């Protein structure tokens, strides 16, 4: 929407849905899901990129006019992530990087110390850094302070489909952030995405929720509408939660029976 821009770095986007490509049953289904989602930005793991192969994910994105967001998936140290980001910039000609530095293979949770180190180095190197982080308001603020263009807290572990387990932390991150906050990881269905947007997230990044759905193309379309609906609800402002009922109609004009006289 023209009156509600979504900007990452210096780049404006119409869609607030960032798609991933991992886990798709086929390139054909991935392509149709990307179209249905309306995404303009799609992340690709650099370790899976082969720019010279016809019929690759990159060729699909190029044909659809979707901007590539390389990521550093699979990196365990700041050094590995920085090297991967620099290779991505050389290969793809973009300063955008989705920064991932994970602590272990079992949880795939971010390593906050290595992440912050890598983020600071890449910002100094001229990258537009979008870090995958824990739902920690303090770490989110530190990532913003070193110059990250957004913060991307997880709702729950990657691929878990558990949704946002700590909405309160998301609200704290959103309230104090001066950069876009993007849900990254954990969404399982459209209601998770709508909730993220209602909490004030500027966008949503997802992959498994679509690529592993029974009908990926339908789910992609559902996610597209969920992002829009959640954003509109956030901008509109929900009514306060109450412990008791509050009638929507005024009391004026109600029928009153005389207690001294029977109704019939």
Swiss-Prot record:
Any one of the GO CC terms: cytoplasm
Regions of compositional bias (Basic and acidic residues) in chain numbering: 253-264
Region spans: Disordered: 243-264
GO terms for MF: thiazole synthase activity
Subcellular location(s) of the protein: Cytoplasm
Main localization of the protein described in the UniProt heading: cytoplasm
Gene Ontology biological-process annotations: thiamine diphosphate biosynthetic process
InterPro entries linked to this entry: Aldolase_TIM (IPR013785), Thiazole_synthase_ThiG (IPR033983), ThiG (IPR008867)
Pathway: Cofactor biosynthesis; thiamine diphosphate biosynthesis
Sequence positions that bind 1-deoxy-D-xylulose 5-phosphate: 159, 185-186, 207-208
Active site per database record: 98 (schiff-base intermediate with dxp)
Pfam families membership: ThiG
EC number in record: 2.8.1.10
Superkingdom classification of source: Bacteria
Keyword terms: Cytoplasm, Schiff base, Thiamine biosynthesis, Transferase
Reaction(s) the record says it catalyses: [ThiS sulfur-carrier protein]-C-terminal-Gly-aminoethanethioate + 2-iminoacetate + 1-deoxy-D-xylulose 5-phosphate = [ThiS sulfur-carrier protein]-C-terminal Gly-Gly + 2-[(2R,5Z)-2-carboxy-4-methylthiazol-5(2H)-ylidene]ethyl phosphate + 2 H2O + H(+)
Gene3D superfamilies registered for this protein in UniProt: Aldolase class I
Binding partners and assembly: Homotetramer. Forms heterodimers with either ThiH or ThiS.
General function of this protein: Catalyzes the rearrangement of 1-deoxy-D-xylulose 5-phosphate (DXP) to produce the thiazole phosphate moiety of thiamine. Sulfur is provided by the thiocarboxylate moiety of the carrier protein ThiS. In vitro, sulfur can be provided by H(2)S.
Protein family per UniProt: Belongs to the ThiG family.
Record's protein name: Thiazole synthase
Organism: Streptomyces avermitilis (strain ATCC 31267 / DSM 46492 / JCM 5070 / NBRC 14893 / NCIMB 12804 / NRRL 8165 / MA-4680)
Recorded name of the encoding gene: thiG
């Amino acid at each position: 929407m023209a009156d509600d821009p979504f900007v990452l770095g210096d780049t404006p986007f119409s869609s607030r849905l960032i798609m991933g490509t991992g886990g798709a049953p086929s390139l054909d289904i991935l392509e149709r899901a990307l179209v249905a989602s309306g995404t303009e930005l799609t992340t690709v793991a650099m370790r899976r990129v082969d720019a010279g192969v016809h019929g690759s994910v990159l060729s699909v994105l190029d044909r659809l006019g979707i901007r590539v967001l390389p990521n550093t998936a699979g990196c365990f140290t700041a050094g590995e992530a920085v090297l991967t980001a620099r290779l991505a910039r050389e290969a793809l000609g973009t300063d955008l990087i989705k920064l991932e530095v994970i602590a272990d293979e079992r949880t795939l949770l971010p390593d906050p110390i290595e992440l912050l180190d890598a983020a600071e180095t890449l910002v100094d190197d001229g990258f537009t850094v979008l870090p995958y982080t824990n739902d920690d308001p303090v770490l989110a603020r530190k990532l913003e302070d070193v110059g990250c263009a957004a913060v991307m807290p997880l709702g729950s572990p990657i691929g878990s489909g558990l949704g946002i387990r700590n909405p309160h932390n998301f609200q704290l991150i959103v309230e104090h952030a001066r950069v876009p906050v993007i849900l990254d990881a954990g969404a399982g269905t459209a209601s998770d995405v709508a909730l993220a947007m209602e909490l004030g997230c500027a966008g949503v990044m997802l992959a498994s929720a679509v690529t592993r759905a029974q009908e990926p193309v339908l789910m992609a379309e559902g996610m597209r509408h969920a992002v829009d609906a959640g954003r509109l609800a956030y901008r509109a402002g929900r009514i306060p939660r109450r412990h008791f009922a509050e009638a929507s109609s005024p009391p004026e004009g109600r029928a009153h029976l005389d207690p001294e006289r029977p109704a019939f």
